[in-house]
């Protein structure tokens, strides 16, 4: 046994993911990578919109971005390029988030917990992050590889699983999460309403409409959320705009009076790590 390495002075999964704080840090990595979809120059959600009927390229200060769509999705193309397209990031960033979530899920029983409620809250958030990625992937690609545990050694034999099977698996996970994820969360983190909102979309994808009504109603009737019907925020006294304008102003997104906010992707000009100070470029790049 003396040849067996024991990481006493370095960080390793065995001596790091030992409590709620440590496992939640892995889920913070999921939150970080989730914001990559939206922020910065040519983020992938703009690529997705341009490759659909939602938008056309609006960039006028450089060439190359989304100019030859059929050519830019060929197998030998670079689909993670600010000057062309970042459509491929849905795959690479998605499976990174799945990896982080699976690390938490696989190690959930190895940590020390204060209560079952604390444990299941963290587990429920991990289920949410994994389900959120798979919901996007199956609607973009159809059948995709389904990875449900932490991978700790080289693996090459990945096979696709049917879209419906994946949707049914993530529905089951989200139903568990909806029972345990807490109602309140720090701005930018996952709360119960976010779980039920995603569960509603999964139910709709499965054409299980009564279940969709139930999960949507859980958000609408939680006493916290609801449709905004009155002007609010920084421009509420400006007669030239309306409530739709109010909802889409960055100054108003995180206001407590905004009852339509469920889960916020947080950016801050004072945070420079990992592009956290970057803003949305959709008004520049998508028309």
Task: List each language-model region with its residue ranges.
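Structural transition elements
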Residues: 153-165, 208-211
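An aromatic- and glycine-enriched ligand-binding surface/loop that stacks and positions planar moieties
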Residues: 2-65, 175, 193-287
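Short, well-structured active-site flanking segments
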Residues: 138-149, 209-216
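Solvent-exposed loop/turn segments at secondary-structure junctions
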Residues: 144, 152-153, 268-270
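Short linear capping/connector segments at secondary-structure termini
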Residues: 8-12, 79, 148-155
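Glycine- and aromatic-rich loop/turn segments at beta-sheet edges
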Residues: 145-150, 179-188, 227-233
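Conserved, well-structured interaction surfaces
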Residues: 19-43, 61-141, 157, 161-164, ...
């Amino acid at each position: 046994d003396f040849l067996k390495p024991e990481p006493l002075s370095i960080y390793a999964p065995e001596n790091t993911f030992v409590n709620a704080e440590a496992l939640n840090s892995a889920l913070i990595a999921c939150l970080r990578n989730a914001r990559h979809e939206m922020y910065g120059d040519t983020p992938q959600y703009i690529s997705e919109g341009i490759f659909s009927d939602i938008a056309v390229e609006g960039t006028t200060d450089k060439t190359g971005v989304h100019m030859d769509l059929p050519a830019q999705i060929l197998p030998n193309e670079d689909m993670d390029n600010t000057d062309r397209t970042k459509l491929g990031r849905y795959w690479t960033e998605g499976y990174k988030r799945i990896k982080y979530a699976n690390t938490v899920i696989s190690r959930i029983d190895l940590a020390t917990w204060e209560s079952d409620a604390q444990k299941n809250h963290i587990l429920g958030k991990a289920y949410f992050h994994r389900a959120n990625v798979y919901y996007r992937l199956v609607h973009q690609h159809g059948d995709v590889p389904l990875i449900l545990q932490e991978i700790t050694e080289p693996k090459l034999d990945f096979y696709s699983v049917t879209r419906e099977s994946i949707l049914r698996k993530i529905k089951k996970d989200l139903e568990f999460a909806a029972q345990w994820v807490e109602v309140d969360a720090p701005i930018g983190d996952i709360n119960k309403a976010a779980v039920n909102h995603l569960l509603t979309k999964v139910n709709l994808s499965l054409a299980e409409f009564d279940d969709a009504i139930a999960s949507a109603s859980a958000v609408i009737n939680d006493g916290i959320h609801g449709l905004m019907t009155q002007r609010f925020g920084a421009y509420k006294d400006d007669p030239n705009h309306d409530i739709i304008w109010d909802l889409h102003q960055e100054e108003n997104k995180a206001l407590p009076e905004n009852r339509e906010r469920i889960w916020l992707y947080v950016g801050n000009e004072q945070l420079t790590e990992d592009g956290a100070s970057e803003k949305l470029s959709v008004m520049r790049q998508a028309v």
